Amino acid sequence: MAESNGKGSHNETSSDDDDEYEDNSRGFNLGFIFGNVDNSGDLDADYLDEDAKEHLSALADKLGSSLPDINLLAKSERTASDPAEQDYDRKAEDAVDYEDIDEEYDGPEVQVVSEEDHLLPKKEYFSTAVALGSLKSRASVFDDEDYDEEEEQEEEQAPVEKSLETEKREPVVLKEDKALEYEEEASILDKEDHMDTEDVQEEEVDELLEGTLDDKGATPLPTLYVEDGMVILQFSEIFAIHEPPQKRDRRENRYVTCRDKYKSMDISELVEDDEEVLLKSHGRIDTHVEQADLIQLDVPFPIREGLQLVKASTIGGITPESREFTKLGRDSCIMGELLKQDFIDDNSSLCQSQLSMQVFPLDQHEWERRIIWEHSPEISGNSGEIFEPGLEPEGMLVKGTNSETEQESLNVVNSRVQVQADNNMFVPFSANLLESFGSRGSQSTNESTNKSRHHPQLLRLESQWDENHLSGNDEAGVKKIKRLEKDALGRFSRLVLRERDLGDEAWLDSIIWDSEKELSRSKLIFDLQDEQMVFEIFDNEESKNLQLHAGAMIVSRSSKSKDETFQEGCESNSGWQFNLSNDKFYMNGKSSQQLQANTNKSSVHSLRVFHSVPAIKLQTMKSKLSNKDIANFHRPKALWYPHDNELAIKQQGKLPTRGSMKIIVKSLGGKGSKLHVGIEESVSSLRAKASRKLDFKETEAVKMFYKGKELDDEKSLAAQNVQPNSLVHLIRTKVHLWPWAQKLPGENKSLRPPGAFKKKSDLSTKDGHVFLMEYCEERPLMLSNAGMGANLCTYYQKSSPEDQRGNLLRNQSDTLGNVMILEPGDKSPFLGEIHAGCSQSSVETNMYKAPIFPQRLQSTDYLLVRSPKGKLSLRRIDKIVVVGQQEPRMEVMSPGSKNLQTYLVNRMLVYVYREFFKRGGGEHPIAADELSFLFSNLTDAIIKKNMKIIACWKRDKNGQSYWTKKDSLLEPPESELKKLVAPEHVCSYESMLAGLYRLKHLGITRFTLPASISNALAQLPDEAIALAAASHIERELQITPWNLSSNFVACTNQDRANIERLEITGVGDPSGRGLGFSYVRAAPKAPAAAGHMKKKAAAGRGAPTVTGTDADLRRLSMEAAREVLIKFNVPDEIIAKQTRWHRIAMIRKLSSEQAASGVKVDPTTIGKYARGQRMSFLQMQQQAREKCQEIWDRQLLSLSAFDGDENESENEANSDLDSFAGDLENLLDAEEGGEGEESNISKNDKLDGVKGLKMRRRPSQVETDEEIEDEATEYAELCRLLMQDEDQKKKKKKMKGVGEGMGSYPPPRPNIALQSGEPVRKANAMDKKPIAIQPDASFLVNESTIKDNRNVDSIIKTPKGKQVKENSNSLGQLKKVKILNENLKVFKEKKSARENFVCGACGQHGHMRTNKHCPRYRENTESQPEGIDMDKSAGKPSSSEPSGLPKLKPIKNSKAAPKSAMKTSVDEALKGDKLSSKTGGLPLKFRYGIPAGDLSDKPVSEAPGSSEQAVVSDIDTGIKSTSKISKLKISSKAKPKESKGESERRSHSLMPTFSRERGESESHKPSVSGQPLSSTERNQAASSRHTISIPRPSLSMDTDQAESRRPHLVIRPPTEREQPQKKLVIKRSKEMNDHDMSSLEESPRFESRKTKRMAELAGFQRQQSFRLSENSLERRPKEDRVWWEEEEISTGRHREVRARRDYDDMSVSEEPNEIAEIRRYEEVIRSEREEEERQKAKKKKKKKKLQPEIVEGYLEDYPPRKNDRRLSERGRNVRSRYVSDFERDGAEYAPQPKRRKKGEVGLANILERIVDTLRLKEEVSRLFLKPVSKKEAPDYLDIVENPMDLSTIRDKVRKIEYRNREQFRHDVWQIKYNAHLYNDGRNPGIPPLADQLLEICDYLLDDYEDQLKEAEKGIDPND
């Protein structure tokens, strides 16, 4: 090197070593290539040939003026060469740079630093006088420069072009790393405050050498210093890096003196090579960085804020110390806030620090820092530097760990001693300061490692910041620099000593920050398109504009300053110190530029997607989707017409009505508000109150609807029948204009997330741009929720590398989103290739990518916006685009997968965390039912398992369980909650629900994966129907969203390498016509025929090859091979010449050729011999790409908008628009239509046809059930709003009684859980869907969306909370029902073991006979029932009773009754059925007598489980159930003294009553009345009413007992006390017909006669005769007459039945052939069944005579009693037939009223046939079949006073309300009149249908004239 090098070190070392590397003086670096040199700088041996010597001499002459300290100058003078060779190394003007610009340094992970990297650092061979200049031009051959930047640098740095040329062989260092390589690189700024986008090092070189180097010396080579304008080369720097590793020890040995001096501190033997790499590059602690000053990337890294950047200036000289200290290494950082420490004045400490410097082994140090430099030449004023003065006193800190070296400490101090530059002084070097070791090797390593932490953007930020800061404090900086010069040595000593403890972070606590002076930042230049940058800026004025308009994320400044450390290679800051696996060293060693280049080439063109804050917090996503939400998942429906909740209408009167009336006013947007109004207030007053809640002016025109009718503003609520707790819909009709909606938010608001869209209100369309996107797919795989972000990108495919049109697209205003330019060699980001020179826009999210195609926006198109409060607004649309087929990036969750369960658990935990810390934890717990409802797909066990970790499970006094927050639970940070559930996970889950919903409606519930039916398909028989159905199921399972997304992601996750594994075309095509891609996985082989597969399988069991199959050519005989060849048209002459094997070979060849050419051959004879055509993998890929490109082009052509095509099809488009308008009107009509006032059961009974002019298809049972469930959920929400006040009152005071509170519904706690022995949540068992309202504003609707909901009988069908469920074996099971007084409450009740007890006294469940609450407690033993079958009483089925059949058990009535939970009113249950069901089931009217002292009305009470299903389920639902038997337990015990007093009340009937005065059956007032009987009423009941009389309690009982006992539903026949209890079984048949219902009626004394007949059949004549004689003495004459009248009526009824059948037989011939055939068939079936029943009855009768016992069947015989009566056999047969008829018809229809007269029955039969005929004429009668609902015609009842329809007429016929044909015709005429009255002028097509209907009716009446006359004659006019 320079001669000064040798003088500084050779004096001590030259005599100690004589090997080839012994000289460390001038030119010692030449020894690496030229051999050893002597003391004079000459070579000690002639190693060079003549050419090399000439070249070296020429080079020395050229640079001679720059090498004053090297004796090589003399050598060069002696060996001067020709002038022509003087420019040998000059870069020619036409020189071409052949370096690969993509060739970059791979970093320490790939290129491990060798030993010579540390032995010979580049800085150590620099001249002391050129410390600054030589370090500035770092573009040596050791650096892998980005030559694109160097070309630009050459234009700006022409003077140094030549000097930098020869250094291109230096090892590669990335350009962004060089900025921090040395202190000089980071400390020089351009004088003109210019900041370019190139490396800081390049501009620093330009500033240093500007004006000092002439054009001749501007060679881009490493320089030692500048002298006389010439650049001096540094040969050792060029060649020393190539020193072999094995010579390292020998080089160390030549420093004998230095080595001995520091030998005591050398521990190089303890450190391995890999540890050296680790210690030099890993774990560097940037403790000086404050959080507020960070600019973060994806991998956090610190900004070296305190880095001192110096500006080029002129100084007179520089001290030796400054020369040392100016060599600031890359690994040292200087804080802008320095430590408050004074420097030690003792300069001798610098010498003493030499020992302390040697802390680590020599191989870990930059040992060349020990070289002592002397006689440094004076530097010219232009090459000096001035240190930045403004930041010096703020503080200083050296970063490093045990891996850092003394060089870092020296460099820190060196940077401070530069300050002598201002004084223009030259101080000779006098101290023995050693340079730090490792300035080359470690820096090369550290540069690469720091590269991951420092973005190129940071270089400009740092430079600009320091440059701006330098300008204002020059004067103060001079003083600080002087002080630093004085204290440098002491400070250096202490910092080096402290470096040992840098690994221990305790020293961080001792840092004192000087915050007296606020450091201001200058305006920064940001790359707003760089999405990888995350800025954190100060909250000052100049940064606000940047914050609002930055493209990258901006993180607000932390409120608390923290000293944080960072670790390269870690994902986050937290816990980096525990990263012991050294992940950085196992990362891919490519640089960020290389990774970015590879990323672009691999088609991963993705930008970061930002979501709004509400979306990240899942505030815009429902925890549970309703069935309507899932059904309309891909096409959400808006409600534009008021929709009444039928359940709410039914229950509104049952809610509390105390105080003012509560009304819920709800807008169509979904916003509801509860208002308190007086019942006499007007609607205008209600509207005024609603205006304050729903934010509209009182003067604004709004409409209010109640039950489909618009309310009049002037009338009061009471006058318009607005009930308490009602739901009133408010419709705002005014449309507001938003002309300025397209304006962007103001300057004080952000435009992009996360700064923008921080609240849900920010997500509205009231401002900003609106793009409408329409998906071309019917069911896109995934859809984003509200608030989720998406990126718009436009890809441009270059046609050539020089194509610059992509840059022009960025400047065009119509370009969508970011422009991504694809090079010619890049792959397309889509399945199809983008054509060269073309662009394609796309929308990209984290879930999918899809192409978009802009469409022409019509000038007349506007967007109508409706707010949640119902406000309508109109705004412009910015763009409208069509979204092509999605390419998923993530998989949709699969049902039953582990990912699904994990998501559900995490979603629940996130919900619970947020609720706990929002509610306050313990004060507002979370009900367990709430979690079960919201996360119904999780079982209770899973919920409890996960909740126990964070919450405590408790119960309240009502037995309700809830969760409270644990005291030790800490609120997790929001970032952790975001990681648990991302918005994309929610979308994936909702897509899965939509897929399951579709499968459910297709009837596919057992399979969710196509693989699950492969075995099932193999087992199917070869039947076309079965195979077609299986194929349909398989196809539907293949196109589920989870299968399609999984297939695509699996096949494209490796750069679309396996796209050929998809079908591309086929069933998965969403367009269905070749415009989309099919993501169904391709079958590995074509499926063979089923028969062929079986044969192959059968043969395969014997041998694994084709041997033995039909395709085996070896099985062909000579003749068979000849026949096959003849089919191939081979001449017989050729065949005859060939042998058998030649024939077989020819068959194989010909069949394979035809199969390959596509010729169709018979697959069973010829084609089966063809060999399969196999393609190579490349051929398959090419074929798949061609398919994709073909589909892509078709999709592009179809979805792109072309003006020409639009103009050509304008007329067609207009016609389509008209058609669409008509369809839209029909849809709106359908929305307004709905079901009206039809009950919920009517939804199951809808007919195919039209309502009005709209076609309405018949809804499936699944849809009906879902609609019912959604209404129940909606009603639960309404109840929650209504009961808020009640709940608040209950929290303040205890409930005084069960009868107080909010009424019978909704209950505060659910008692609707299924009461059965099986677990509720068992799979495939029974799905529970109970509804309950919680007082804490929560509600419960348990369901399972994944399971098969086989039958949903919602609580609408049982308004009092009762539900009907069916399990897998189709046996109905009911819940417990308790009937109490009015205003009762419902709460969940534990099922105790007591309920299994059966009382031996009264037969009731729940207590024993010794219980004082028993009705028969302490009663005489004689009065207790005898012979009770305990098995039957306990609910065990007998031999004649199917298992599981429910019973109507005795009703519990005791003092404990007020504790019961549920009140059930069969009365109300039947009301809901009377509009929709064909029959009302079997309503019963009970009348009973009670003690005279208790005559108040009381409802009937039932014991738990007493009403199972017969009376409630079948009656309420009107749906045929599997449980067909209803039982009434009739107590057979009666007091002897009661028999006489109660003889008047001994008539028992199970038939509904018929009131002749009113002409209608009381059974059609569905109720269970509990009215007490007065003495006069009892007599009337005996004669005119057919009731079940309940006797009073025994008069012999104590008074208190009698009063405490309330009347039971215990029916006692008039028998002696010794009679055991009997059961009357009523079965309902499975047939659905409405004939012979008159046979069901019985006389008031039927119960007595029944008992007598049973006794007669038992054969006890003697007892009967005795009983008759006894009773005849007691019976009064009046009663005798009644008795015989009943007998006559019974006989007459039997004759009427026969007459009716005769009428039926006569009418068969007159009816149409189809009807006649049906009636004949029914009659045959009926007669056969009756005959079977008679035979069974006879057999039973014979058995009973032999062995009388209690049996349950159609005929029941009582055990023998002495007082039993005996009646004729004829009466018994009549009773049997009555029961049989009742069983046959009761399933569908309510029991028909009694038809007492033959004429009435005949007339009813004829009229019913006429009605049925009219109903069959659907083309005429379809509009008149059902009553007109309010939704079809809201004003219908206002216009039509007497509505009539065929259903009503049929009901009146069955009730025998018509006395003649004129009454019947009048009702048909009423239909015609109503049709004209309402539809004239509205629907002109309807009145003609009504006219035609009346004409047909008249024709039928004439046809039946004779029969009608005969029937009318038999009708008593006085009757």
Curated annotation (Swiss-Prot):
Main location: nucleus
Listed GO MF terms: histone acetyltransferase activity; RNA polymerase II general transcription initiation factor activity; TBP-class protein binding
Span of domain Ubiquitin-like: 661-737
InterPro entries registered for this protein in UniProt: Bromodomain (IPR001487), Bromodomain-like_sf (IPR036427), Bromodomain_CS (IPR018359), TAF1 (IPR040240), TAF1_HAT_dom (IPR022591), TAF_II_230-bd (IPR009067), TAFII-230_TBP-bd_sf (IPR036741), Ubiquitin-like_dom (IPR000626)
Tissue expression profile of the protein: Expressed in roots, leaves and inflorescences.
All copies of domain Bromo, residue ranges: 1794-1911
Family from the record: Belongs to the TAF1 family.
Protein name: Transcription initiation factor TFIID subunit 1
Organism: Arabidopsis thaliana (Mouse-ear cress)
